[in-house]
Amino acid sequence: MSTGTFVVSQPLNYRGGARVEPVDASGTEKAFEPATGREIATFKCSGEKEVNLAVENAKAAFKIWSKKSGLERCQVLLEAARIIKERRDEIAIMETINNGKSIFEARLDVDTSWQCLEYYAGLAASMAGEHIQLPGGSFGYTRREPLGVCLGIGAWNYPFQIACWKSAPALACGNAMIFKPSPFTPVSALLLAEIYTKAGAPNGLFNVVQGGAATGQFLCQHRDVAKVSFTGSVPTGMKIMEMAAKGIKPITLELGGKSPLIIFSDCNMKNAVKGALLANFLTQGQVCCNGTRVFVQKEIADAFTKEVVRQTQRIKIGDPLLEDTRMGPLINAPHLERVLGFVRSAKEQGATVLCGGEPYAPEDPKLKHGYYMTPCILTNCTDDMTCVKEEIFGPVMSILTFETEAEVLERANDTTFGLAAGVFTRDIQRAHRVAAELQAGTCYINNYNVSPVELPFGGYKKSGFGRENGRVTIEYYSQLKTVCVEMGDVESAF
């Protein structure tokens, strides 16, 4: 399949093991191909009746799934992972068409997706409580039990991967899931739903409900939704938290960031430059944990900046389905204009643009209406500038200089966000000392933006709470029951 040829021809809701049109609507949305600006779908946003049907369907599947053994759930997840591997290129192409990231990156996203399913398949078969001996031969034990119907709300930057990150632990624990993709990227979650069905999951175990804010509200406030896991912006996360609070629902929030990347003078310069590029330009800079505040020790600032600019200018921008493309378009026209606005604001506030920050028109005429820009490096930045304080969510790196470790730690932590942070240094004591002081949920030492499924991922402060990936996520998709067993006579005060 080539850029500019795909059009959605099937329903985008998935309920009861099949694609369906919603029985009612709360408006419509359009989905676009970012590379060309071409509309690929107009779809109905699910109304309250459709949400109710999806929840009832998921409840029925939950009754079946929650009674299966961990080994039986493991087998379904492993089969789903196998199918994802088998359909790797197909899924990656769909992701690239609807999201705009390069096919090179999209394939890596698919790989981390099947790895996630395999990891939680292993945990599904090993979930257990504990036995506690009590006086007189009595004892207690704990059971880790599923919550019920869980709601996953995805973001548009990693549509398929996020659907896997949320559904794999939920299903491993014995839950059912309803997944609402971002209306910007409605396509690839349907592929995952079909894969779960083909792998042997009960019909309704993973339903996909399309829609915007109104659909999300129907889902969050539904009495039979037991848990909400959301990836997205801080303002939307606050609204979801308010809605979930009214139903006393547990939630996981993975929100925005303005992460610091600290480059000490004793670093391996080659690796530090690579790390800075990874921290800023993956998925066109549209990554919540990006290290967009790059603090460079003064002794190496000039050399580091020169090399970062040189390598940034070499990044191949263009058709995201071509193998040599490393940067595709941003998600849509309003977001492109927003990011370009941050660059204009930075210049007005005194920052210097060393490269990029401009709209880009690829040579291929079919891409002329795509949402492209050149990756941008800003220098002469100060901590009070808008480009340094606010999440841009685009390919814009702000370089700042520092002199001492104590100084940079204070500045790095001076933010309401706390999703990630990074440090490059050859001093292993300093590396661990700095990581301990950084106020962030994930700290990278001598690397950046790696996400092994074995490691928990989540934020501090306004970047959210709860975790995705790692063994600990089982605790966020289950509840603990304590059983107390008396082996003797009851001693009573009455």
UniProtKB/Swiss-Prot annotation:
InterPro entries: Ald_DH/histidinol_DH (IPR016161), Ald_DH_C (IPR016163), Ald_DH_CS_CYS (IPR016160), Ald_DH_CS_GLU (IPR029510), Ald_DH_N (IPR016162), Aldehyde_DH_dom (IPR015590)
N-acetylserine modified-residue sites: 2
Tissue specificity as recorded in UniProt: Detected in lever (at protein level).
Cell location: Cytoplasm, Cytosol; Cytoplasm
Substrates-to-products reaction catalysed: 4-(trimethylamino)butanal + NAD(+) + H2O = 4-(trimethylamino)butanoate + NADH + 2 H(+); an aldehyde + NAD(+) + H2O = a carboxylate + NADH + 2 H(+); 4-aminobutanal + NAD(+) + H2O = 4-aminobutanoate + NADH + 2 H(+); formaldehyde + NAD(+) + H2O = formate + NADH + 2 H(+)
MF terms (GO), sorted A to Z: 4-trimethylammoniobutyraldehyde dehydrogenase activity; acetaldehyde dehydrogenase (NAD+) activity; aldehyde dehydrogenase (NAD+) activity; amine binding; aminobutyraldehyde dehydrogenase (NAD+) activity; formaldehyde dehydrogenase (NAD+) activity; identical protein binding; NAD binding
Modified sites of kind N6-acetyllysine: 30, 298
Active site residues per record: 254 (proton acceptor), 288 (nucleophile)
Pathway noted in the entry: Amine and polyamine biosynthesis; carnitine biosynthesis
GO cellular component assignments: cytoplasm; cytosol
Keywords, ordered alphabetically: Acetylation, Cytoplasm, NAD, Oxidoreductase
EC number: 1.2.1.47, 1.2.1.3, 1.2.1.46, 1.2.1.19
Record function comment: Converts gamma-trimethylaminobutyraldehyde into gamma-butyrobetaine with high efficiency (in vitro). Can catalyze the irreversible oxidation of a broad range of aldehydes to the corresponding acids in an NAD-dependent reaction, but with low efficiency. Catalyzes the oxidation of aldehydes arising from biogenic amines and polyamines.
Similarity comment: family membership: Belongs to the aldehyde dehydrogenase family.
Assembly behavior: Homotetramer.
Protein name in the entry: 4-trimethylaminobutyraldehyde dehydrogenase
Gene: Aldh9a1
